[in-house]
Amino acid sequence: MATVTTLAYKDVKTVMTKSSLPVGGYSVNPYVGCPHACRYCYASFMKRFTGHTEKWGTFLDVKNWPRITDPHKYDGQRIVIGSVTDGYNEHEATYRRTRMLLEQLRGTSAEIMVTTKSDLVLRAIDVLKTLPKETVSRSVNTPDEAFKDDMDDAPSIERRLSAMKTFHDEGIRTVCFVSPIFPGITDVPAIIDRAKDQADLIWLENLNLRGQFKGDIMRYIADKYPQLVPLYEEIYNKGKRDYWQALEAQVKQICSENDFPYLRNDLPYGRSKPGKPVIVNYFYHEEIRLNNK
């Protein structure tokens, strides 16, 4: 578990932020910072906007916002909770900001999606069941706990998968978010096979390396997986897509053989047929950006 050395309250005018993300009309983050401290996390770039100089993962601001008194304002929207934090990080057990947010949104017809790596979200089953369109998305990019521990301080993969099954069994729409896919490391077919009976959708997103964490990840690969250095050089320094195109073809074959619906850069709503999750490919981020302009 990450050690948060700086914890403070932060007053904000609103917790609801219009989103530029493809998946959300509103992006909602009850906390600033994230104790999971994922080494590959794109959200770490947010630190420059927070006033914090501490290392990403070691600070957390607990947001205070005016109560949402008109949840119907968000009817027909999609609300994503946890785009640059985990609303169910371990401190949620104390501060309950995400719980409070969900309770304030009761009555809206909005589609509400909670993204998390934590099984603390199990505490929210009761309130989620009061919402008409609820989804819980959980990130799983490896069955290897040692690799997971190298990458983040979040709960174990087994705990995540167990929580996913509980939500699915409770009738709550579930997403297994296979992200980020590390070339040569993430076993996508194995994760699809493990999640197929407990997820309505399986999202696939490739590892994108940018900013300060690119160097860190490349050094990690050189140290722990030196045989993969040429592959990572091809993808991340030369811009080659061959690996992703081959993986896409493999996933399409799996879908064809198992009668899994396959989509690209889409976000359908609804429950899947038992054992037939919808597989959604998000490998091509530039296409998503162009389609959402």
Regions found by a protein language model. Give the residues of each.
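Generic structural signal for well-ordered alpha-helices
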Residues: 66, 99-102, 125, 160-164, ...
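Structural preference for beta-strand elements that scaffold enzyme active sites
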Residues: 78-80, 111-113, 135-137, 173-177, ...
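Auxiliary Fe-S-binding modules of radical SAM enzymes
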Residues: 2-11, 189-293
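Conserved Radical SAM active-site core
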Residues: 1-135, 143-146, 157-158, 169
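Surface-exposed amphipathic alpha-helices with a cationic face
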Residues: 106, 129, 162-171, 252-258
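Short acidic, glycine/proline-rich loop/turn micro-motifs
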Residues: 147-151
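Conserved strand-turn element in the central/C-terminal portion of the radical SAM core barrel
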Residues: 153, 165-186, 237-241
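Active-site beta-loop-alpha junctions enriched in small/polar residues
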Residues: 84-86, 117-119, 139-143, 179-181, ...
